[in-house]
Each structure stands twice: as structure tokens, then as C-alpha cells.
């Protein structure tokens, strides 16, 4: 099993992708003078989300004695970051490490690019393609369709996947229905990544740090990170069975904080 060197976290509570997306939309909503009641409702939801995240972190910190290697890798704590670190910040003069990712060779179910090799880098490229396709759909149907086709049995479902939760938070904070809106534009760029570790050739825990650009009359940007168990099933990588891994820090790509957290620049070859 290959593991990244352990990095000590800061101890700050980690914000989930759903919470960060809701916060992004709150900034746009406030700027557009939408009713204060919406803001209060979202803040209430975020408070509960933080409580749930802390409970999950405590559980991850005390794994069961009979935990498998895959579970141990997935639940191992990641570095943490302040929520403000997810917002655009000064780009570092320091060069980050580089991860070279393969390019897709075909199109798979739910219009997700596929054909990546059976390597850790291939699994990371596949996760990036899954997330980009799901979130750029801008609708609940879009994210549900993607995870239905790209999760192994025992993995995330259209009800439990963090991507579904994130889309629901974004649409709710924007005052939109589950169908989205022609006025909503979401551009998702996988900018940095890391390979947390592998167990054999068919299992990897990988993370992608995305730059989200969301436009609803005005444009806002934020970094959102996603870590998933990736399993080789048949002839492709899919999101594997089990609970989603410990979250990676959502940090604006290219900053000192991102490099310190272990993120590496992604380069397609």
C-alpha cells in the first residue's frame, strides 16, 4: 500500500463541499439583495453540517481494530484549512509538485469521459471527469444520473453522494429548483490533485481540488475539494464501495496554503 507522508492538520473544522457551495451562493445572494430569510435558512443548515462533520471526524480518528487496509486509508485524517482559504487568494511564487494525468480515450455512461488506464493517475483523472460532468450539469437530475452510472455497488447513491448534497445546497442557496436555471452557469476546473494512497492495483484514494466559477447574474469563485475511493471494476475506474473518505482541504489552487497542504498541479499528457 502506498501512502503519502503524514501531514499534521491544523485542528480547524473542515467545511464540506456542500457547505462551501452554499457559502459561495450566499455571497452572490447577498450581493443581489435577496430576502434575508434565505440567508438565515442556509446558515442554519450550515451549522448542522459543521456538527455532522465534527462527529464524522471523531469517528475517523478512532478506526475499528478490524478495519481493512482500504478503510484505514480512506479514513486517515487529512490536513485541514480555514474556510477563507477556499476563496481566491495570492498565487505563490513557489512551484508546486506536478501530477501528470492521462487523457480520456472515449465517452462513457452519462456522458462522462473515460478510457483512463489502470493506474493511480488514471483513477484521479476519472474522478475529475465524474465530478466535472456532474456539477456542470447544474441540476439534481444531472448529478444523480452521473453517480448512478459511476458508483460501484455499496458506494455512494443518488441520495447519499456528497455531489448530490453539494448541488442541492447550491441550488437552494440560489433560490432555484432542482431543475436549475438557464441563468445558472457552473464551470468546474480540476486544477490540483493528490494521490492519498493505494491498496493493490485496483483501489486508490485520490483527491481533486477544483476551481468552481458560478454565475447567477454575477460571478463568484471558490475552491472545492473532493476525495473518493476509486475501484477498478471491469474495464474502468468507478467510485468504490464504502463511506466517502476523510475530506481534503478546499484551498484556492496555487496558493501557499494549497502547496503546504500537499496539493500538486495537474498536467494532462
Give residue spans per PLM region.
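Terminal targeting segments of Actinobacterial cell-envelope proteins
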Residues: 1-22
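Short beta-strand edge/turn micro-motifs at domain boundaries
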Residues: 85-103, 223-254
